[in-house]
A protein has these predicted regions:
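Alpha-helical segment proximal to the catalytic Tyr-Lys
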Residues: 124, 168, 172-176, 238
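Residue(s) in the substrate-gating loop at a strand-loop-helix junction
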Residues: 139
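Substrate-binding pocket helix/loop in short-chain dehydrogenase/reductase
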Residues: 95-96, 103-108, 134, 206, ...
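Canonical Rossmann dinucleotide-binding motif of NAD(H)/NADP(H)-dependent dehydrogenases/reductases
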Residues: 3-32
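Short C-terminal tail/terminal secondary-structure segment
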Residues: 144, 230, 241-254
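Active-site helix of classical SDR
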Residues: 119, 159, 167
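Short, small/polar-rich loop/turn modules that mediate ligand/substrate recognition or access, typified
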Residues: 85, 175, 180, 240-242
């Protein structure tokens, strides 16, 4: 097992990429401290994982108290922290002229500030053991702006560019202290993020069009991103740090 006896924190664990990552980590032997704002979903997931292998911290990870509690729970329950997966994220389909200040701040808080807060409270524990792995969820939008059919991504792109630069800054600061920091950069992963954006037919057509835009010819699945996260979190990636790992079906190779 690639994460046998390692302790991993996963934010946004209740759905999508976070859910797929949690289930994969559990199969690979990790002990888990899971966060989501959805209490019911997190409790169901904890049942699937097994309470002997998992703990749950329900709350808004954009709040410092939640990030602090995640680190404290991991150390209290399992003694140390080996892996941090900063996965929590939100998406607002608003153009710059329509987005409210509150929506802008919420995007920045969940997609970027939460990464800062979790790193702030986890890194001291990793420094004491002189080892750790951080995996941030970035995006192809860390590199490019993008407008889909009727979907504005401008503010989301800004947060993901920040996630990439956070990863690079963590690398230059902490690589010599045994802490690796990497990010995965997915494109068009078929989750429920757009479920309430339009009719089921509209959503299905959007995913079809997204898949057609990729050289591989289809959208990705959360499990495919989880596999990349597992690699970066594992000792197999012991010489990999500062890496933006593309999981994009060839999109940026065009």
């Amino acid at each position: 097992m690639r994460l046998q006896d390692k302790v991993a924190i996963v934010t946004g664990a209740g759905s999508g990429i976070g859910l797929a990552t949690t289930l994969l980590f559990a199969r690979e032997g990790a002990r888990l401290v899971l966060n989501d704002i959805d209490q019911q979903g997190l409790e169901t997931l904890l049942t699937d994982v097994g309470k002997e292998k998992g703990r749950a911290v329900v709350g808004d990870v954009a709040l410092e108290e939640t990030a602090r509690s995640l680190a404290q729970e991991a150390v209290s329950a399992f003694g140390h922290i080996d892996v941090l997966v900063n996965n929590a994220g939100v998406f607002f389909d608003k153009d710059i002229t329509d987005m409210t200040v509150e929506e802008w701040e919420r995007l920045m808080d969940v997609n970027l500030k939460s990464m800062f807060l979790c790193c702030k409270h986890v890194i001291p524990h990793m420094l004491r053991q002189k080892k750790g792995a951080i995996v941030n969820l970035a995006s192809i939008n860390s590199f490019i702006g993008m407008e889909l059919e009727g979907v504005s991504t401008f503010a989301y792109c800004i947060t993901k560019a920040g996630a990439l630069q956070l990863t690079k800054s963590l690398t230059t600061r902490y690589a010599a202290e045994g802490i690796r920091a990497n990010c995965v950069c997915p494109a068009f992963i078929e989750t429920n993020v757009l479920k309430h954006r339009g009719t089921p037919q509209w959503v299905a057509e959007l995913w079809r069009a997204a898949g057609a835009a990729l050289p591989i010819g289809r959208p990705g699945q959360p499990e495919e991103v989880a596999n990349a996260i597992l690699f970066l979190a594992s000792d197999e990636a012991s010489f990999v740090t500062g890496c933006p790992l593309l999981v994009d079906g060839g999109y940026l190779a065009r």
